[in-house]
């Protein structure tokens, strides 16, 4: 029969025991599995002859200690295994990301565990080398440098650019550029040539026109009031010569070919 002494529950089989500590066979009575010790569990330390009993309360049972030892052993043994599992999950996540990136030009590669391979890296964890995946930078097509000269060439090659300047302006610019390269004697020669060619073409047109007499009267009337022009026309030969024909051939017959062969970038400055 159990007895109660100062809120201490003592099993009945401990009343006749003279031993200070309970035996190993009686340890089951102190466990949490026994109905007597469902609420409290004590470690019986000693009992003297004068009736003084010393006890020490402990909140840790043998099962808790064993569970603690097992958990420590489990976590100590599986720490590396857990790291490998996390590492495997990271690799799966990174590989799923790499699968979404297009690999048309071979710009995306997986790094190998070799330290000599270019673009690969690794980390050390748990005493072992763990390979990591890397995404190389996507290579883009290099564009040609854009300069101001390219812009000017594009503007000149534009089809709408020819509408801004008329043919007379092009001819005037060409004549100005050509006259700057000629000497004074050459410019005078060209001037006289153009006068003779113009007068020769006018004489031919007057001979064909039915109202040639009226045109001659008008021209003579205009020439009578202009003494400088009349004196200059006297110096000009009335008939064309070989130089005039050469200039006419160079100017009129070869004009289209010369304009097409002449660089457009030099024609407009």
Curated annotation (Swiss-Prot):
Lineage: superkingdom: Eukaryota
Keyword Transcription regulation: yes
Keyword Transcription: yes
GO process terms (BP): circadian rhythm; regulation of DNA-templated transcription
Keyword field: Activator, Transcription, Transcription regulation
Null allele phenotype: No effect on circadian clock.
Swiss-Prot/TrEMBL induction comment: Repressed by members of the TOC1/PRR1 family of clock genes.
InterPro entries in the cross-refs: LNK (IPR039928)
Job of this protein: Probable transcriptional coactivator.
Quaternary structure, from the entry: Interacts with REV8.
Name of protein: Protein LNK3
